[in-house]
Amino acid sequence: MQQRVIVGMSGGVDSSVSAALLLQQGYQVEGLFMKNWEEDDGTEYCTALEDLADAQAVADKIGIKLHTANFAMEYWDRVFEHFLAEYAAGRTPNPDILCNKEIKFRAFIDHAMTLGADFIATGHYTRRGESMQNSRGESYAPLLRGVDNNKDQSYFLHAVHGREINKTLFPVGEIEKPEVRKIAEKLDLATAKKKDSTGICFIGERRFNDFLKQYLPAQPGKIVLDNGKEVGEHHGLMYYTLGQRGGIGLGGLKGAAEGAWFVLHKDLENNRLVIGQGHEHPLMQSTTLWSQDIDWVAGEQDIPASGFRCTAKTRYRQPDQACTIYRDEDRNNGVRVEFDEPQRAVTPGQSVVFYTNEICLGGGVILHTDAPTPDFI
């Protein structure tokens, strides 16, 4: 009997080709288009209608049924409110990671099972390992890096539990992006030449600052140099991220050396933005970070008192960094991560993700680091 797969179809080329490949592999395939954001009437920002039309065109072309589901309420409750709270607390969140965990897998799987699915599938560039059991006897599948190193998306899926990975197929995770485009062109799919989506799904093509100030009041404050000297005003700390180059709005500073300016530190207590020159400025360097509420793909991870050796990324596409993980007993499911080499601009609110070779072990949100605090604070 054919196994039934519901493919999350976004209107992009990756999910389109995923559906086509699964058909070729003999599965009974249907699509599901998820609407996760209720755009304002009359706005031109959201491409949801165009994306739905593209997904429908592909479904019609390859001869499958396309379902639709509205997860906007779940998205608001589980993702967007957290996103706003993190910005309000002075951190820089990554909503795509929470969206994958809560919506594109958890809510999607729940909905797909009501449609009689054996599996779901997505267009992510990751792979699923062989199903196994953890020490509690729970079945899960390891999350593996995608074959295409340049497109590997395991960083964004690290918070998805292995029991959900166990129910998911990743057809394009086994091939490279140029090959995906070729398959789409060969099949004459409407999405073959469509650009990859960029930015956060609920913002669309809007300027980020304009979007954020609709929900959070901006609190302007002083811009200061790394010696404490005031040199200007910022629009609100939430608009800046550590290590950011440019976009600070200073122009040429009288008496300053030529060179780029970087965000070095956010002084939340005094609402000051600390900037300085030098890509490797000491105030941006850290060797240790702390995280809590770690999501382990296996549902668990044995970390001995002597520490656990692995590699980690603190941002997407960063080369793997050798590190040792220690348990942090002061925090719920917390860890302390010590890197072999100093790390630049590790940002609270972003995620640290752990790997052993091809296996993505899981990760968590960065709370803080041991980067030095400016002397004048």
Curated annotation (Swiss-Prot):
SUPFAM superfamilies: Adenine nucleotide alpha hydrolases-like (SSF52402). Keywords: ATP-binding, Cytoplasm, Disulfide bond, Nucleotide-binding, RNA-binding, Transferase, tRNA processing, tRNA-binding. The record marks 124, 350 as: Interaction with tRNA. The active site is at 99 (nucleophile), 201 (cysteine persulfide intermediate). ATP binds at residues 8-15, 34, 123. It is found in: Cytoplasm. Its EC number is 2.8.1.13. Residues 94-96 are annotated as: Interaction with target base in tRNA. It catalyses: S-sulfanyl-L-cysteinyl-[protein] + uridine(34) in tRNA + AH2 + ATP = 2-thiouridine(34) in tRNA + L-cysteinyl-[protein] + A + AMP + diphosphate + H(+). Disulfide bonds join 99-201. InterPro entries: MnmA-like, MnmA-like_C, MnmA-like_central, MnmA-like_central_sf, Rossmann-like_a/b/a_fold. One of its GO terms (cellular component) is cytoplasm. Catalyzes the 2-thiolation of uridine at the wobble position (U34) of tRNA, leading to the formation of s(2)U34. NCBIfam families: PRK00143.1, trmU. This is tRNA-specific 2-thiouridylase MnmA. It comes from Acinetobacter baylyi (strain ATCC 33305 / BD413 / ADP1). The lineage of its organism: Bacteria, Pseudomonadati, Pseudomonadota, Gammaproteobacteria, Moraxellales. The gene is mnmA.
